[in-house]
């Protein structure tokens, strides 16, 4: 009888150990493969950059052509093509209210970094790393970095 109890305990511990190992393995694989915000945005841009550039090149300041749906883009501002203004393409929006982050890319007609989205009133951009950033002294933060000619990555958080 005692031998059966010991065997039963060992089986129970082995099952618990197997469940624990499976949970650890699942957690490691679920967290390890997720691309960064920047990688996600750059992937969307790379897949559609030729089409976006062509639409901008084919338009003029009088055009009010609506953008077709772009894969991976959730918001475009302004919603029409105008080669003379900054055009924002938001690809990621996570979180809620004061704990949110947005990221995307934008077209800059003069190939200069710009502030897009809600961060427009946070002040001047200053050099940081490979790009530029600004903050209003709170947890609101904006970062932008050149992708290629006339296109920049941006990330804003609050």
Regions found by a protein language model. Give the residues of each.
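Sec-dependent bacterial lipoprotein signal peptides
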Residues: 1-29
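Residues in intrinsically disordered, low-complexity segments of regulatory proteins
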Residues: 6, 66, 117-119
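General secretory precursor processing signal
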Residues: 10, 31-34, 137
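Intrinsically disordered regions, especially transient/low-confidence alpha-helical propensity segments
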Residues: 28, 64, 115-117
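N-terminal export/targeting and maturation segments
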Residues: 31-96
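Extracytoplasmic electrostatic interaction patches
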Residues: 75-158
């Amino acid at each position: 009888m005692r031998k059966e109890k010991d065997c039963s305990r060992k089986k129970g511990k082995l099952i618990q150990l197997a469940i624990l190992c499976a949970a650890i393995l699942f957690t490691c694989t679920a967290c390890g493969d997720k691309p960064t915000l920047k990688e996600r945005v750059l992937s969307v841009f790379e897949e559609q950059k030729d089409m976006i550039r062509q639409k901008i090149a084919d338009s003029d300041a009088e055009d009010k052509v609506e953008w077709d749906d772009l894969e991976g883009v959730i918001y475009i501002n302004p919603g029409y093509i105008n080669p003379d203004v900054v055009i924002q393409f938001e690809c990621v929006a996570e979180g809620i209210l004061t704990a949110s982050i947005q990221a995307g890319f934008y077209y800059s007609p003069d190939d200069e970094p710009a502030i897009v989205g809600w961060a427009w009133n946070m002040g001047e951009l200053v050099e940081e790393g490979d790009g530029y950033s600004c903050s209003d002294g709170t947890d609101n933060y904006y970062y932008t970095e050149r992708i290629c000619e006339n296109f920049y990555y941006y990330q804003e958080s609050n």
